[in-house]
Amino acid sequence: MFYPDPFDVIIIGGGHAGTEAAMAAARMGQQTLLLTHNIDTLGQMSCNPAIGGIGKGHLVKEVDALGGLMAAAIDRAGIQFRILNASKGPAVRATRAQADRVLYRQAVRTALENQPNLMLFQQAVEDLIVENDRVVGAVTQMGLKFRAKAVVLTVGTFLDGKIHIGLDNYSGGRAGDPPSIPLSRRLRELPLRVSRLKTGTPPRIDARTIDFSVLAQQHGDNPMPVFSFMGNASQHPQQVPCYITHTNEKTHDVIRNNLDRSPMYAGVIEGIGPRYCPSIEDKVMRFSDRNQHQIFLEPEGLTSNEIYPNGISTSLPFDVQMQIVRSMQGMENAKIVRPGYAIEYDFFDPRDLKPTLESKFIQGLFFAGQINGTTGYEEAAAQGLLAGLNAARLSADKEGWAPARSQAYLGVLVDDLCTLGTKEPYRMFTSRAEYRLMLREDNADLRLTEIGRDLGLVDDERWARFNEKLENIERERQRLKSTWVTPSAEFAADVNAHLTTPLSREASGEDLLRRPEMTYAQLTSLSAFAPALEDEQAAEQVEIQVKYEGYIARQQDEIEKQLRNENTLLPATLDYRLVSGLSNEVIAKLNDHKPASIGQASRISGVTPAAISILLVWLKKQGMLRRSA
């Protein structure tokens, strides 16, 4: 039977991608349905209890700038907040928070249940309704059919998921949850390229069996950082420390002696695992010169006795896992409450997607999260938001939107996936962005909130706060530009006390702040340049904008040059065999990838600058040279 009411957008899956997709579509005013096999696991953290980190924190801030959920949820659930790379430049500083799993899930569910235009429904999806290469709905396991103008697949590791512990394996979407086998089979019938990937998780330890007294503590930062632009530290629950232990030669011997029982090394697992989050087996074998690896013991929550040992993801048999755990300092008597495991699952080639994350072959069908070959909550959330907003726009007969590489880490993520694809689980790093000086955590709102407002994602309260911040920044910069000090002034000695080279000529507040040794706090502590802004975010922005003004201007010039190529569109139906002068290799790669623009084509491996020049000349000759707005 058909459900009586049609929807604009259906989201399949309630993880980090699915919840962001559902919130985005509903915020934009579209009638949205979120289908999940279990409402109680909405926003579940399947692996590590943490949000953020290098590159990942940038994505969370961007999701927040576009009105998303993740940053606000972790502000209410974070039990330890830190700024990573705090001593380095602003481009690579990143926020990270340990999470209370239960509080995080509660924060996500509360937001979903209070979001207008959004309906939750508990049923596993087994089929899609596709008519004339267009998706028009979904079918649940009890045969109930839902109609919609767009469908977003955010199914994580559930598609034909297979869990491995030692040489034993069984079907599962994650520990304790069933896999989605019928939907996997249905998707394999569609004209989509599919492969297998693998990820893993460590065993969980009973905290009461760990001797923390012999371990080093790691505390959060004080003052506590905040993730959301709209958040504040008073929202954070009780803060707790993490602890640090290490593997040792005994640990490594246990692993080496049992490699024949590892499903990866025995050839049982076919899927490729994440390069930047390897299993402990991989670390021991790949870094054989290391006699120890640092392991962080992270609490899973304020009301839980479980500890997440970050760094010993494994699929070795349970008896070997026990030996590994008990070989480490402080854990000689530790008990495992959940075994570690590896999981293999289907993923679909993201090169078959448009930058909006809509399928090139099935109209109205969007993909987001691990199904696209990524790993990590943050990467999933960012894709979910993008897919959800574009599903909403499609259902309203509006053009899709995707950020450029120069606008957001989300733009880098999507461009990497859709242009290059991936053969291993993809995670975000700041090093993946060529314009990272422009793509900082601190300016995510300046880059994206106005766009989010235009898209219908940003509410009135956030918009008012954002504009107030802009006004504070502009007013303070003007004040510093117009406040001067001369070498002969009475307070010049106070200024010189903060400078490595004394004043030799008249200088404005901005001139002084531009000096490497002068901070905004020091400058505004001087009577001539007081008072400091009360808005700490605006004050930080003033300092960064002034100190890095020259570098930022130079990078902006580079971006504008690149945009000329980036915005030169390529016809989706162009057969590159028609372009004389291109090599057979380039023709094959362009016909395979079908890039949307010259910029995208230039990033395909093997497509040379000479080939791009030939293509531009041919397009001009054919009268097909056009640029997007």
From Swiss-Prot:
Pfam family, one: GIDA
InterPro entries, per database record: FAD/NAD-bd_sf, GIDA_C_N, MnmG, MnmG-rel, MnmG-rel_CS, MnmG_C, MnmG_C_subdom, MnmG_C_subdom_sf
Residue stretches in coiled coil: none
Compartment annotation: Cytoplasm
Subunit record text: Homodimer. Heterotetramer of two MnmE and two MnmG subunits.
Functional note: NAD-binding protein involved in the addition of a carboxymethylaminomethyl (cmnm) group at the wobble position (U34) of certain tRNAs, forming tRNA-cmnm(5)s(2)U34.
Keywords noted in UniProt: Cytoplasm, FAD, Flavoprotein, NAD, tRNA processing
GO cellular component, one term: cytosol
Highest taxon above the source species: Bacteria
GN (gene name): mnmG
Similarity comment: family membership: Belongs to the MnmG family.
NCBIfam families referenced in this protein's UniProt entry, alphabetically: mnmG_gidA (TIGR00136)
Cofactor annotation: FAD
Binding sites annotated in the UniProt record for FAD: G13, G14, G15, H16, A17, G18, V125, S180, Q370
Protein's UniProt name: tRNA uridine 5-carboxymethylaminomethyl modification enzyme MnmG
GO biological process: tRNA methylation; tRNA wobble uridine modification
UniProt cross-references to HAMAP family, sorted A to Z: MnmG_GidA
GO MF annotations in UniProt: flavin adenine dinucleotide binding
Main location: cytoplasm
Binding annotation for NAD(+): 273-287
